[in-house]
A protein has these predicted regions:
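A structural signal for well-ordered alpha-helical scaffolds and beta->alpha junctions
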Residues: 10, 107-111, 150
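Conserved DEDDh/DEDDy metal-dependent 3′-5′ exonuclease domain
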Residues: 23-108
């Protein structure tokens, strides 16, 4: 709300970006969160992100996210001026679990909804709370939240790949649904 709404991604101030490949996580951040660094979690400066994303795409990598095409990629492209994001968008080198489910079923299912009902797991913070927590100095909490979201998306995607089904509560129909997925 402070930046004038979702249509103004160029005005966003990106504080943290995380990636997770199923084994190793990267937290791109310019604040001290070194205590989050583990054998499978790397802490890197935000300035390194564009190089890692470019290398990943050059190696044929695809990005995975929930609502990645409508939110994450435009924010990275417009607010951080990461030019290689255009490659991902133009080449459709991403898997957007939200867009796939929404297109197939005509209803949007949040990451929280799908993860609760499919995996029995939930997000550790609502996305709307992250800027408030960040401004109050909760850099570690926001970094953990971002990394956990990446892990949840990966686990949901993997479950869908292995079982061809994810589960969610349909707000439109007020019932639990098994959603067949092909991703």
């Amino acid at each position: 709300h402070e930046i004038g709404g979702w249509g103004n991604t160029h005005m966003f101030q990106v504080s943290t970006v995380c990636t997770w490949d199923g084994d190793v996580g990267n937290i791109y951040i310019d604040k001290n969160v070194d205590s989050l660094e583990k054998s499978n979690v790397n802490i890197k400066p935000l300035s390194q992100l564009k190089f890692d994303l470019d290398d990943f795409r050059e190696d044929g990598g695809y990005l995975l996210g929930h609502n990645i095409a409508a939110f994450d990629l435009p924010v990275l492209k417009n607010a951080m001026d990461i030019y290689c994001i255009k490659k991902y968008l133009d080449e459709k080198a991403y898997i957007d679990t939200s867009a796939i489910v929404s297109k197939a079923y005509g209803e949007r299912y949040s990451l929280s909804n799908l993860c609760q009902h499919t995996l029995g797991l939930d997000k550790i913070m609502d996305s709307a709370d992250a800027p408030v927590v960040w401004k109050s100095g909760g850099y570690m909490e926001v970094a953990e939240y971002c990394l956990k979201d990446c892990q949840l998306v990966f686990d949901l995607w993997k479950h869908g790949q292995n079982n061809s089904i994810v589960k969610g509560y349909s707000i439109d129909n007020k019932e639990m649904k098994e959603l067949e997925v092909k991703w």
